[in-house]
């Protein structure tokens, strides 16, 4: 039985568009995510 291809195909532009900082700042929920990560002291806030 064959396995098939790997599902993770890295792409920096897509990564930024889907999980990036600008996208997080657009919505209220995203802003709360960033603020909670700031409070926790995360080194990276978003992708």
Swiss-Prot record:
Entries under Gene3D superfamilies matching the protein: 1.10.287.3980
Alphabetical list of PANTHER family matching this protein: LARGE RIBOSOMAL SUBUNIT PROTEIN BL34M (PTHR14503:SF4), MITOCHONDRIAL RIBOSOMAL PROTEIN 34 FAMILY MEMBER (PTHR14503)
Annotated protein name in UniProt: Large ribosomal subunit protein bL34
InterPro entries for the chain: Ribosomal_bL34, Ribosomal_bL34_CS
Keyword entries, A-Z: Ribonucleoprotein, Ribosomal protein
One example of a Gene Ontology biological process annotation: translation
Ribonucleoprotein among keywords: yes
Family: Belongs to the bacterial ribosomal protein bL34 family.
One MF term in the entry's GO annotations: structural constituent of ribosome
GO cellular component, one term: ribosome
Superkingdom, taxonomy of origin: Bacteria
Disulfide bonds: none
Record has Nucleus as a keyword: no
């Amino acid at each position: 039985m064959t396995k098939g291809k790997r599902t993770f195909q890295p792409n920096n532009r897509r990564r930024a568009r889907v999980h990036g900082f600008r996208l997080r700042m657009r919505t209220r929920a995203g802003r709360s995510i960033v603020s909670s990560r700031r409070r926790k002291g995360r080194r990276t806030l978003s992708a």
